[in-house]
Amino acid sequence: MTELSVIIPMAQEWPMSAFTVRSVMEELEGRVDYEILTVDNWCPELEAQIKKSGALKDRSADHFDALQKGYPWLKSLHYDKKLSHWQAKNYAVSQSKGKFLWFCDAHVAVRRDSLFNMFTYYKEHYDELNGTLHLPLSYHIMEYHKLIYKLVTDLTRGEVHYSFTTYRNAEKPYQVPCMSTCGMMMTRQIYDDLGGWPVELGIYGGGENFINYTLAVLGKTVNIFPGKQLCHHGDKRGYSWNGDDYVRNRTIANYVFGGVDLARKFVDNRKGSKRVLYNILDNVLDTCKDHRAFIERNQVTTIEEWIAAKGLPLPAA
């Protein structure tokens, strides 16, 4: 019976994707009943960008399609509806079997025993954690220093965000307000409680805001597993996104965890055409209303109350 499903979305990641899968396999083989689900996100939008740039098509999908025939722990999936690693992850979860889910990018190296030890701990303590567990990160693969996230807010502008900060060591896992979804472990039940990532999310922005701050209003926690970091390879992938996509994704996240007013404040304070911005807002309020209603029915606090409990200032009434 599969215990752990490892979800790895990819778009223009070759050959780092192969090294990523290999490092995960080396970590788990013979130690955990696991599966690795790679999700190739080649789609018309990405194809058009790659043709325009003159870059070569990613070889990852062909490689993993062939490889899965000899490795029962590997599933090579394809998601081509739109360019979005959030939707690629949603699709992979729907095809997975594990009670526990671990998400990572296709450009990481897993340090020996880090993932195994984290999974061993999480399997024993997930009930008391009541939330997610994350490995610290190094942004560039050869860096020694470790990073986590810190909370960055300005509710007058609809900003509920994050940035990198220095990791602090500890003897056991500790709570933080937010953390990267690269290296994130959760139960399938928590994924279901979140409703998965909102189906309207595109390629960039919003996905981590959604996870962290929807967990917050649901009364769940975000936790760091101290020790070895997940070594991340920060680099360009040969594709891009535009500002409207980013605003839309952040607006989706704000709306789902914070409601109409928070989404509107965020849009009010963006630069650009007001007509375009408010068209984005209207579309988000229409297409994401079911997900917002789902979270609103189950939340135990508001994002404003949660921020106040962290000791951060709220805007004047």
What is the predicted role of each segment?
Residues Y79-S96:
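Glycine-rich, basic loop-to-helix element that forms the pyrophosphate-binding segment
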Residues T181, N242-A317:
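Terminal low-complexity segments of carbohydrate-biosynthetic enzymes
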Residues W86, T166-M185:
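A recurrent flexible, glycine/aromatic-enriched loop bordering the glycosyltransferase active site
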Residues T38-H63:
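A conserved acidic beta->alpha catalytic loop
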Residues R22-D33:
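Short, acidic, metal-binding catalytic loop of nucleotide-sugar glycosyltransferases
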Residues D105-A109:
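The conserved acidic donor/metal-binding loop of glycosyltransferases
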Residues D113-T156:
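Conserved donor NDP-sugar-binding/catalytic core segment of glycosyltransferases
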Residues L101:
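Short aromatic/hydrophobic "clamp" motif used to bind/position activated sugar donors
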